[in-house]
Amino acid sequence: MEGKKAPRGKKNTNNMEVEDISKIQENAKHTIKYKYTTFDELKEQGEYNFFGIVYDASFPQEESSTSESDKKKNVTKYFCILKLIDQTTNCLTNPNNFNENVIYLIIKSTEKENIPFVHNIGDIIRVYRGFYAPKKKRNIYVNVCKDNKIKGSWCLYSTNNNSSEPYSCSNKQFSVETQDKQIIENTKTWVKNYLNIDKSLKYPLQVNLINRINDGNDNDLLVHVVKKIELNDQIVLFIQDASDGCELHTYKYYNFIQENDIIRVRSYKVFDNNNLIINEFGNILVLPPYSNCYKSLINDMTKKLKQIK
């Protein structure tokens, strides 16, 4: 009696059907849904998908200069600028020419909620369809349009938890693919190791708090939040570093800041009684406790207290 033939598309005793091989090859193509580009691979002008790590960020702003067509349509545009690094382009890989290599991500939209409000240095951003157009700086532009007609999109991920879900996103219909989860997990591990290294963060405009008045330049601070008070429409942060202390008055947008946080105050100005407010294009970003900058400031303040005692 003749044995039964193996069904088409299933394994024979000695070989595999061509149809099965084709299916495996086709499935392999779909395992990687998106191609992501690292910053050292950005050479030619064009559209790219990528992951970046937030090194610095401005607060979402209304764009002052709009086109004549926008004025006629009464269209308001918003934007923010993020400085990004990755495993291939950062303060350690480019110590002598970092500012020439850091990525400037400019995100624009007609809806303010589509502009990212970054909370922490070291947060991860995923960008789809960012347009790389290098000029004097390495700029990438993302336009998030009104009425869900999205030319580009972004998602923000915190490095302070183990979740692969974003805490903020420009597109409510975002997806997190299997490849994304692996990239996010690996990037979080890298960020924690990187920020723990000395000189992994360099902010040339940073000054000591005691020099906040003497220097009229547009400078930055790295300070410890001693106390936080919530008022009607604002919060008051009592801040200090190893040199001095004062008050920082700001809006409730920054209510995510907690007592004992170490924060980067990006662009400030002094007002009544030597207190501070944030400049128009300034921002406040929280430093993660595993970062070297965080630990260094705590050590400096501890030494200062011991000297006083």
PLM regions with names:
Residues 1-309:
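Single-stranded nucleic acid-binding proteins centered on OB/S1-type folds
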